[in-house]
Amino acid sequence: MLSTRLALRSNIPMADFTTWRVGGPAQWLLEPASVDETLEALQWAQQEHLPCRVIGAGSNLLIHDDGLPGLTLSLRKLQGASLNAENGVVEALAGEPIPTLARRAARAGLNGLAWSVGIPGTVGGAAVMNAGAQGGCTADWLESVRVAPLVGGVSFELSRDELDFDYRHSRLQDEELVVLSARFRLEPGHDPEEITRITSGNLSHRTSTQPYTQPSCGSVFRNPEPLKAGRLIEGLGLKGNRVGGAEVSTLHANFIVNTGAATAADIDSLIQRVQQQVEAAHSLHLHPEVKRLGFTEAA
C-alpha cells in the first residue's frame, strides 16, 4: 500500500513531462517530493512486480508514442538545495533544476556552475549524463551522489571517482541506480555580482545561439571530438530538414525542435535520417545524447 502522501495516477500523457512535448501515456505515474517518498515508490513498484522508469525534467528524453508500461517515477518535484558560502559545499536533491542551482550559487559567491545555467535539466540528470556546456561539465564539481537501487536495497553514496565519468557519460547510465541527491564542492569567496554577471552572460549566449523558445531536448548528438556534431550536420545542408512536425533547427543544427505537432516517431525518424547522412558523408556514426524510452531497437 502506498501512503496517502503519494498520489498514484494512471494513463498520464508523458508529453506533459518531456521538453520535446511528445510521448504516449504512462500506465502508472508517481511524483515523489522527498527522498523517503522516492524510496517508498521504488519499493511499491517492486512489490507490485511493475517495471519502473525514473525521469527528471524530461530533457534528453524521447518517449515512444505508445507510452510506457509499469510505473514511471517523475522526480521533478524532488527539489531543494543547501549552499554553504563558507566552504563551497552544495547539497541538492535530484529534482532540483540545474539553472536554479546555478543562479543560487552565483548569488552566494560560489564559482563553478555558471556554465550550467542554460541546461534544461535536473541535478540527477546532470550527474547521470555528466552534463556540460561552454567548457564546463558536472564531473568538474561533483563530489558525490546518493543513489538507490531501482529494484530492492538501501541507498548508498558513490564518490566522484566511483562514477567513472567520461564525456557525457557516467556509470549511472549502465547500472539500475536512481540518483536521490548530489553534493558539489564549489569555489567560495567570489564576488556574487561578478559570478552573476558571468552566469547571465552564459545564458544570453545560449539563448541567442540555440532554439531556446521551441520544444527540444537540448543537443541531440554527442560531439565526435574533436569535431562538432552541429557543424557536420549544418555542412550537409540539413538545417530546416523535416519529418512531420520535427525539424532540424535553423538556428543550431544539433537541435531537433517540435514545430507544434511532432510525434516521437517523427523525431526518431529525423534522428536516423541525420545519422545516415552524416555516416554516408563522413564515415562517422553520431551517437545520440538522447535516452529513448519505450523503443525496442537501439539508436
Swiss-Prot record:
Coiled coil: none annotated. It catalyses: UDP-N-acetyl-alpha-D-muramate + NADP(+) = UDP-N-acetyl-3-O-(1-carboxyvinyl)-alpha-D-glucosamine + NADPH + H(+). One of its GO terms (biological process) is cell division. It comes from the Bacteria. Its cofactor is FAD. Keywords: Cell cycle, Cell division, Cell shape, Cell wall biogenesis/degradation, Cytoplasm, FAD, Flavoprotein, NADP, Oxidoreductase, Peptidoglycan synthesis. It is found in: Cytoplasm. InterPro entries: FAD-bd_PCMH (IPR016166), FAD-bd_PCMH-like_sf (IPR036318), FAD-bd_PCMH_sub1 (IPR016167), FAD-bd_PCMH_sub2 (IPR016169), MurB (IPR003170), MurB_C (IPR011601), MurB_C_sf (IPR036635), Oxid_FAD_bind_N (IPR006094). GO terms for molecular function: FAD binding; UDP-N-acetylmuramate dehydrogenase activity. Its EC number is 1.3.1.98. Residues 21-189 form the FAD-binding PCMH-type domain. Pathway: Cell wall biogenesis; peptidoglycan biosynthesis. It is an enzyme of class 1 (oxidoreductase). Pfam families: FAD_binding_4 (PF01565), MurB_C (PF02873). The active site is at R168, S219, E289. GO terms for cellular component: cytosol. Cell wall formation. Belongs to the MurB family. This is UDP-N-acetylenolpyruvoylglucosamine reductase. The gene is murB.
